[in-house]
Every structure is written in structure tokens, then in C-alpha cells.
A protein has these predicted regions:
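N-terminal secretory signal peptides that target proteins for export/translocation
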Residues: 1-2
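Sec-dependent N-terminal signal peptides
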Residues: 5-13
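C-terminal motif of bacterial Sec signal peptides marking the signal peptidase cleavage site
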Residues: 17-18
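N-terminal mature-domain "stem" immediately C-terminal to a signal peptide or N-terminal signal-anchor/transmembrane
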Residues: 21-76
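Short coil/linker segments at helix-helix boundaries
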Residues: 59-116, 123-244, 248-276, 310-341
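Extended alpha-helical scaffolding segments
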Residues: 281-325
Length: 342
């Protein structure tokens, strides 16, 4: 892709100030924000599980978790149901301290009632990891207070110990390793130790793609990587004979592209490999509007008018706000796909 085309695409899709003509305004007015039926199914599942959790109906949660671990179901976008189960217990970071303490008590009650439950301990470790980040905040390291760092470290250590206790149980859960990778990143586990944990995770469940997202994210330059590191890892993940191939490459880029104006211009990410992965996922999960919208957006970023035009044709005037953000980004990207001009 030429330097001039890349600059044009940046102006076209990133919502920078521009003179909107009547045609653009009319196109925006016609747009229909839509909902993804697969995401709606996920939200309904989470809501049901959250109600059981909030009401301390742990005896109802336990068999659900056990069945999901055994059958390993996926939702219609490739999302693992076990991951969505744990997501249903999450506490938003903007919640007041009193709410975090309330959730802490729920988790402790769960463990007290089911002391041999792998679900209860993994859920509590995940909560403690998020509780640690609640104390630290999202500021850069030099802006975090001394007290913030102290509590951050204490809660991460509590999460690590909870995971260690869970490891003494007979049952295994794929989310144990995903939570462990998050705790290890927060504790700045040395690279060899982190990689060993990752390989152990992949040996347990080779196609559980949350592990690869966690590792790639940790290799962003803002964390513990150097430019090119996460892209190289994506190549390695795609090459694993027991992995997801091009799909995992595309999933990694889908997870990280938001850190860049244009991930294909600013990094070594390969559009042809992302394209292959997106096409594979669209064939496997045809009901997912999220994947369809991401295909349109990423093909625009990749300068692939052929795929972009075809995908926007499938979308029509329907767009998913969670993917596009502002509607003008969708309209400008679609116009480029259809005409090649702004």
C-alpha cells in the first residue's frame, strides 16, 4: 500500500475533522444501528449466570460450569462458553469500593460453601486480579501512587495464591491458565516463566484462543514487548500444528488493532493472513455480525477494496456500533470501498 493511499485511508476512517457534504449526511441518516444475534445470546447467558451469582445460588452454578467444562461449547462467533461464564461475574472498574467489597464477600461465600470447587477459586482469582487493577488505575506507571502500587501487589499475590490452591484440586479448567497469565503479567513474571506457563496452557487446550490474545497483548510495546514482538508471536501461533491457523492470527489482530491508527501501516501485521483468517471465520460462524463488521473495517484498513466492497454490500445500511464507534467511520469506509474516493 502506498504512503499516499495509507494517509488517505487514515483520513477516511478515523473520524478526523472533515467537510461533510449532503451526500454523507444523508448516508449517515439512513444507517441502522443493529444488534448481533450471537452477542445477544451471549448477553442473555451472562445475565442468567449473573443472577445466580448475585443471589448466591452456587448450587445451581456448579453443575452449569461442570457441563461446560466437559462439553466445551462455543457460541456462534467462536467465543468459548466457559470464558463467557467467568465474564458474567465481572465487576466494572468504575464501581465504587463498596461494590468491590460486596463482590469479595460473594466470592468468599462461594468458596466456603464449595471448598473443592475449581469454578469458585478461578472466579475469585479473576476477581482479585481485576480488583488489583482497580487499585492501580489505568494511568501510566509513573503516575500510579505508592499506595496504589502496594495494594496492586497485595491483591495480585492473593490471586496467585488462590490459583495455587485451585491447582491442588483434581478438576482442571481452561480459564485457570488465562487468569494465571493475567496475574503473571501484572507481577512481571520473567519471560521464561511466562512462556512456560503459556506452553502448559496450550498443551492443556490448544484451541483456547484466549491464551494467545493474552500473550500477544503482553507483547505490546506499552507492556513488555518491543516493536514487532506481538506480530512475530501471531505468526508463531498461526503456525502451531494443533492450533487455529489463520484464524488465531486474525483474532490477535482483531484484539489489538485499536491501539493503532492503522495496524497494517504502523506494525508488521500481515493483511493477507488476516484476510485468510477472517474468511475462515465467516465460513465457520456465518451468524456473527461482529465478524462481518470487523471484516469490513479491517479490509478497509488493509486497502482491500474487493473484499471491503463485497462485505459492505452484505451489510447494507446496518452497522454494529460496538465495532465502528461513530457512524461516519462506517460511511466513509463504505464510500471508499464502493468508489475508491472520499
Amino acid at each position: 500500500m502506498s504512503k499516499h493511499l495509507g494517509f488517505f485511508l487514515l483520513l477516511c476512517i478515523c473520524g478526523l475533522p472533515a467537510c461533510w457534504n449532503a451526500e454523507e449526511k444523508a448516508a449517515i441518516a439512513k444507517l441502522k444501528p443493529t444488534k448481533d444475534p450471537v452477542q445477544e445470546e451471549i448477553y442473555a447467558f451472562r445475565l442468567k449466570m449473573r443472577a445466580l451469582y448475585n443471589n448466591r445460588r452456587f448450587s445451581d452454578l456448579e453443575p452449569v460450569a461442570a457441563e461446560i467444562r466437559q462439553t466445551k461449547p462455543l457460541f456462534g462467533n467462536g467465543s468459548w462458553k466457559i470464558a463467557q461464564l467467568y465474564e458474567s461475574f465481572a465487576c466494572r472498574r468504575e464501581e465504587p469500593e463498596s461494590m468491590w467489597q460486596f463482590h469479595d464477600r460473594i466470592h468468599q461465600d462461594w468458596i466456603a460453601q464449595f471448598p473443592t470447587s475449581i469454578t469458585a477459586r478461578v472466579a475469585y482469582a479473576d476477581f482479585l486480579r481485576e480488583y488489583a487493577w482497580h487499585a492501580r488505575g489505568t494511568n501510566f506507571a509513573d503516575k500510579v501512587t505508592e499506595e496504589g502500587w502496594r495494594i496492586f501487589g497485595e491483591r495480585l499475590e492473593s490471586a496467585r495464591k488462590t490459583l495455587a490452591d485451585a491447582r491442588e484440586l483434581t478438576e482442571r479448567d481452561p480459564m485457570w491458565w488465562e487468569v494465571a497469565l493475567g496475574v503473571a503479567r501484572g507481577q512481571q513474571l520473567p519471560k521464561n516463566g511466562y512462556n512456560q506457563l503459556l506452553e502448559e496452557a496450550k498443551a492443556f487446550e490448544p484451541k483456547f484462543w484466549g491464551y494467545d490474545i493474552a500473550r500477544a497483548s503482553s507483547l505490546l510495546p506499552r507492556w513488555y514487548g518491543e516493536p514487532g514482538d506481538w506480530e512475530a508471536y501471531a505468526e508463531q501461533a498461526a503456525a502451531r500444528p494443533d492450533g487455529l491457523g489463520a484464524e488465531i492470527y486474525a483474532r490477535i489482530v482483531m484484539a489489538l488493532y485499536g491501539y493503532y491508527d492503522n495496524v497494517f501501516r504502523k506494525t508488521n501485521a500481515s493483511w493477507p493472513q488476516v484476510r485468510e483468517g477472517l474468511i475462515e471465520m465467516r465460513q465457520k460462524y456465518p451468524r456473527s455480525l461482529e465478524l462481518l463488521n470487523h471484516t469490513a473495517l479491517l479490509s478497509t484498513l488493509g486497502g482491500d477494496r474487493e473484499l471491503a466492497k463485497k462485505t459492505f454490500g452484505n451489510l447494507g445500511d446496518s452497522y454494529l456500533p460496538s465495532v465502528w464507534g461513530k457512524p461516519e467511520r462506517f460511511v466513509r469506509s463504505r464510500k471508499w470501498a464502493e468508489t475508491g474516493v472520499q
